[in-house]
């Protein structure tokens, strides 16, 4: 399996998880107020964690697929807005051909807002930058929602795994 195929499958699965978590949050008694929740005072709120989770996918697809994507950096203002952005990212992932990504040893160069610049091979970018960034923000979403009292657990986080279920267990 190519690094591109692995990354796209991961994004497809885990964007599904993000959508599931956001849907459950939208049904919670605290409502839209949850969007302002944060784990610690110096951490970003839920709405930003959701936006950054989606942005990690979009940025990776743009850097590796050269699709010329313009990021929506506006704040998420509602769960409906969050779900629409997740849906758009899922559609983009589904439409991406892994063969359009560069060779695994192609150089990817990028700068981050604090002024640091990086250069690494495409597979290293995917493995060492894009994937950890994606999971960091996704786990922050999950953790904030747990902290706020949502009844979620591992089955909610790994719901996509049910497509591999076989019965009865051996």
Where on the chain are the PLM-derived regions?
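C-terminal or internal capping secondary-structure element at the end of a domain, subdomain, or sheet
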Residues: 123, 127-168
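Conserved alpha-helical segments that form or flank metal/cofactor-binding pockets of metalloenzymes
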Residues: 42-70, 89-96
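A structural boundary/capping signal
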Residues: 64-68, 94-102, 106-114, 122, ...
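Mid-length scaffold segments of soluble, non-membrane domains
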Residues: 78-88, 100
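A solvent-exposed interaction/effector surface
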Residues: 74, 102-103, 108-111, 155, ...
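Alpha-helical scaffold segments that form or flank carboxylate-/histidine-based iron centers
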Residues: 2-13, 33-55, 73-82, 115-133, ...
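Basic/polar N-terminal segments that are highly enriched at the extreme N-terminus
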Residues: 1-8, 20-26, 162-170
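Structural signal for well-ordered, non-membrane alpha-helices
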Residues: 15, 19-26, 58-61, 87-94, ...
């Amino acid at each position: 399996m190519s690094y591109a195929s692995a990354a796209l499958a991961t994004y497809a699965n885990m964007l599904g998880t993000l959508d599931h978590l956001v849907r459950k949050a939208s049904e919670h008694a605290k409502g839209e107020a949850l969007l302002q929740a944060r784990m610690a005072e110096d951490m970003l709120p839920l709405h930003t964690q959701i936006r950054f989770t989606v942005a990690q996918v979009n940025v990776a697809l743009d850097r590796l697929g050269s699709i010329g994507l313009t990021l929506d950096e506006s704040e998420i203002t509602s769960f409906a807005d969050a779900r629409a952005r997740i849906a758009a990212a899922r559609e983009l992932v589904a439409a991406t051909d892994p063969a359009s990504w560069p060779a695994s040893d192609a150089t990817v160069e990028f700068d981050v807002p604090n002024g640091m610049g990086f250069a690494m091979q495409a597979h290293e970018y995917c493995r060492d930058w894009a994937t950890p960034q994606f999971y960091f923000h996704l786990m922050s979403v999950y953790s904030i929602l747990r902290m706020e009292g949502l009844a979620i657990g591992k089955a909610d986080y790994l719901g996509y795994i049910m497509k591999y279920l076989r019965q009865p267990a051996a």
